[in-house]
Amino acid sequence: MIQQLEITLQPKSRGFHLVTGEIMRQLPKLPKTGIINIFCKHTSCGLSINENADPDVRVDMETIFNRLVPENRPEYEHTLEGADDMPAHAKSTLSGVSLTIPITNGRLNMGTWQGIYYCEYRNYGGARELVVTIIGE
């Protein structure tokens, strides 16, 4: 069985957001065994798997990414869409825009402390579209 659907994440402020529940609420029943791929159709945000318990991790991740890719650098040429746009593209490349997660016994087979992060790198990115592909039996 292969299923593919598009889902929408509601607009979020800049930062790292735990969205496991928001994604799962929009999905059909998962197969007993398989894989799920989640792909973000945008160039200034990303997806990641990281700790789901302590919200300080999300704050620290934002701090780290901002230090790795600062805004307002004179060497940036792509500046028409604002000071946060070119850094957002670079951060998206660093985090990636796709996740593949195993499905076991009809559930995402992630570690106890793992959750799906949506990483918004723009000050305001709007709603974001994800393509979800479920392969399983």
Task: Please identify what each model-predicted range represents.
Residues M1-E137:
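Active-site histidine-anchored catalytic micro-motif
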